[in-house]
A protein has these predicted regions:
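Alpha/beta enzyme core
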Residues: 1-69, 74-123
C-alpha cells in the first residue's frame, strides 16, 4: 500500500499504522513531485529523494512490516534509503525514462553496485 507524500509526516505515519492494522503486509513511501532540488549534482539528488527518505525513516520505525522506499531515488540515495529503514527500493522511473536498453542495464548495474557497496552480500 502506498502512503501519499502529500500528507504531513505524522499523518503518513498514522496512515501506515492504520493500513497495517487493516491487514497491509507492506508499505510504500513516495516523494512525488514535491521534491524539486535547488542544488546540482549529488546534493540535488539527495534533495530530490528527501521526502521519501524521511517517510521511510518515520514509517519503518512505526510498523512491523517491510517498507519500500520509492520516488526520486538514485545510486547516490539507495544506501540512504536502506539506512533510513527501507527493506526495499523502487526505482522504476530511473530506468523507464531511458529508451536505450544498454543504458537501462547500465543504470540497473549502477543501482545494484550502490546497494552492494553498503551490504556486500552477492545480489
Amino acid at each position: 500500500m502506498t502512503v501519499p507524500h502529500t500528507l504531513p509526516l505524522d499523518r503518513q505515519e498514522q496512515l501506515a499504522i492504520d493500513l497495517v492494522s487493516a491487514g497491509a503486509d507492506w508499505i510504500q513511501t513516495e516523494g512525488g513531485t514535491s521534491a524539486n532540488p535547488l542544488s546540482p549534482g549529488v546534493q540535488g539528488l539527495i534533495e530530490k529523494a528527501s521526502p521519501t527518505l524521511a517517510a521511510a525513516h518515520v514509517i519503518s520505525r512505526a510498523v512491523a512490516v517491510p517498507v519500500l522506499c520509492a520516488s526520486g531515488l538514485s545510486a547516490v540515495t539507495l544506501p540512504l534509503a536502506q539506512a533510513a529503514g527501507a527493506a526495499g527500493v523502487g526505482v522504476g522511473s530511473a530506468i523507464n525514462r531511458l529508451s536505450d536498453e544498454l543504458a537501462m542495464v547500465a543504470v540497473v548495474r549502477g543501482l545494484r553496485d550502490a546497494l552492494s557497496a553498503l551490504n556486500p552480500v552477492q545480489i
